Amino acid sequence: MNLQNELIGKKIRMVKMLDPYPIEPNTIGEIWGVDDIGQLKVRWENGRSLSVIPEIDEFEIQD
């Protein structure tokens, strides 16, 4: 199991997303999966489902 798979089920808070239609800063989401290239699949509290690219997007793992 790689480290990213251990993040499944964790809550994250978006800091900054580089996307044409980004998730707003401070939005909370739950990681529900990791795809083949390492993007984190997230269900956001605003109803959106948008992946996070760990090498590009800034986020914080919540306790």
Predicted ranges, named:
Residues L7-D63:
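Basic/aromatic-rich interaction segments and small domains that mediate binding to polyanionic partners
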